[in-house]
Swiss-Prot record:
Family: Belongs to the aerobic coproporphyrinogen-III oxidase family.
Acetylation is among the record's keywords: no
Site feature (Important for dimerization) residues: H175
Protein's UniProt name: Oxygen-dependent coproporphyrinogen-III oxidase
Name of encoding gene: hemF
Length: 299
């Protein structure tokens, strides 16, 4: 089996395993599957769970797509790939829970390969996971980062610190001067050693459930009211802003003629903006700002 097919098989299995775990955690709703094809090449399967007991919407998509010309979002920082054919596969998910005390989360793992005249000229892995709480708890954030740190250990002493820092820098809303959440791991252009890099991708993909599901179980029965719900919807607006303004994956998908429904499944089903909103000083809502700056959560 060639390298691309090995990655592809892992990713389809990962999607299946995460769906099964999320359905078990929700206990009510199940994923609906939408199979699709892309005219230029490839396709995928998008799965959406809606109106569950725990999750308002959970989307997880697998795609395997190809093309004859790289979109600007991909070739801008790799001009030597202009004119190359390409193929990319990945799994991407975003979960939006009902309860404002359960954080929203995102995970993505992907593999990209470019060829010219039948020769592979570039290949790399990318991905990571990050957490976006609305009412954060130190124990949840520390658990999230402990899992991230542990899965990085076999890949070198500096791996966690480097990819945590990359996550903090990538998921940053410059126009708001705040991070999207409390971070996690982020990496891209990882292509020095296929076996080692593929092992790291698997560690990230497999570690996601260990990082997230215990937080869901801990917070899913926390009582909340209209105030918390309104704040959750307001903060979801930041999520939308990041995905539509900064996210390279969203831009790549749209610029490459990708399937808009699948690309935009990351957006929350309900969201609101409020002009000039400022949380009451000393409130639980105001406390969130202390978490939206890069920090050493395990120090």
């Amino acid at each position: 089996m060639n390298e691309f097919d090995r990655v592809r098989d892992y990713l389809t299995d990962l999607q299946d395993r995460i769906c099964a775990a999320v359905e078990a955690a929700d206990g009510k709703a199940r994923f609906a599957e939408d199979l699709w094809k892309r005219e230029e090449g490839g396709g995928g399967r998008t799965r959406i769970l809606r109106d569950g007991a725990v999750f308002e919407q959970a989307g997880i998509g697998f795609s395997d797509v190809s093309g004859t010309r790289l979109p600007p979002s991909a070739s801008a920082h790799r001009p030597e790939l202009a004119g190359a054919t390409w193929r990319a596969c990945g799994v991407s998910l975003v979960f939006h829970p009902h309860n404002p005390y359960i954080p929203t989360t995102h995970m993505n793992v992907r593999y990209f390969r470019a060829e010219r005249d039948g020769e592979v000229v570039a290949a790399w892995f990318g991905g990571g996971f990050d957490l976006t709480p609305f009412y954060p708890f130190d124990e949840d954030v520390q658990h999230w980062h402990r899992v991230a740190q542990a899965l990085c250990v076999p890949f070198g002493q500096e791996r966690y610190a480097a990819h945590k820092r990359w996550c903090d820098e990538y998921f940053f809303l410059r126009h708001r001067n705040e991070t999207r959440g409390v971070g996690g791991l982020f990496f891209d252009d990882l292509g020095q050693d296929f076996e080692r890099d593929f092992a790291y991708q698997r560690a990230v993909g497999d570690g996601f459930l260990d990082a997230y599901i215990p937080i869901v179980q801990r917070r899913k029965d926390t009582p909340y009211g209209e105030r918390e719900r309104e704040f959750q919807l307001y903060r979801r607006g930041r999520y939308v802003e990041f995905n539509l303004v900064y996210d390279r994956g969203t831009l790549f998908g749209l610029q490459s003629g990708g399937r808009a429904e699948s690309i935009l499944m990351s957006l929350p089903p309900r969201v609101r903006w409020e002009y000039g909103f400022t949380p009451e000083p000393g409130s639980a809502e105001a406390r969130l700002a202390d978490y939206l700056i890069p920090r050493d959560w395990l120090g």
